Amino acid sequence: MRNLEDIAWITQAAIFHNRAAFGRLVEKYQAQVRRFFLSQTLGDTQLSDDLAQDTFVKAYLNFSRFRGEASFSTWLFRIAYNVYYDHVKTQHPTDSLETPAVMGRSGRDTDSGLQMDLRHALALLTDAERTCVVLQLMEGQSIDHITMVTGMREGTVKSHLSRGKKKMADYLRHNGYDRQ
């Protein structure tokens, strides 16, 4: 039934320009979108908030392009994915997201060692690997959903997941996180 709620809110927002309905969609999905950006930016809360805001603005302005062929969340994450990669493309080579200054940034001063190590492990991944790993492991998305969001083929997504998980496991194992 949650999907029916989305359809009702989308209809209200798109056809009747009902801002309250759009607000309900933002409330429902903002935590997921923000988590996606926090993982992609390795904990940069300010940048994540800016990118999330850009995502919802673009979604609002482009409601007419939502055809309902996929779920609203898939469409929204596709916008988020594009917003992030547009941001990455505009960065100067020296503005890498994998610098220690960015990796140490967080909205909380009480990050556990594990959270910091996970952030460092994510920093080792390519952007494509990080996107696939974040969507699957942190957002619980299926491979089919990831292929729709990223536009990658299923085999490519599986390959990025395999390599990304291996890199992260190797890093964490090297830093004392053994499976027991």
Over which residues does each language-model region extend?
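Sigma70-family region 2
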Residues: 15, 41-43, 54-71, 90-91
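C-terminal edge and immediately downstream basic/flexible tail or linker adjoining helix-turn-helix-like DNA-binding
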Residues: 2, 43, 148-151, 166-180
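Internal acidic/polar
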Residues: 3-7, 86, 91-120, 142
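Helix-turn-helix DNA-binding module
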Residues: 123-131, 139-156, 167
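N-terminal module of bacterial RNA polymerase sigma factors
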Residues: 1-32, 150, 177-180
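Structural recognition of an alpha-helix C-terminal capping motif at a helix-to-coil junction
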Residues: 50-57, 70-82
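Amphipathic, Lys/Arg- and hydrophobic-enriched alpha-helical face
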Residues: 26-45, 62, 122, 174
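Arg/Lys-rich amphipathic alpha helix in sigma70-family domain 2
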Residues: 61, 65-68, 78-98
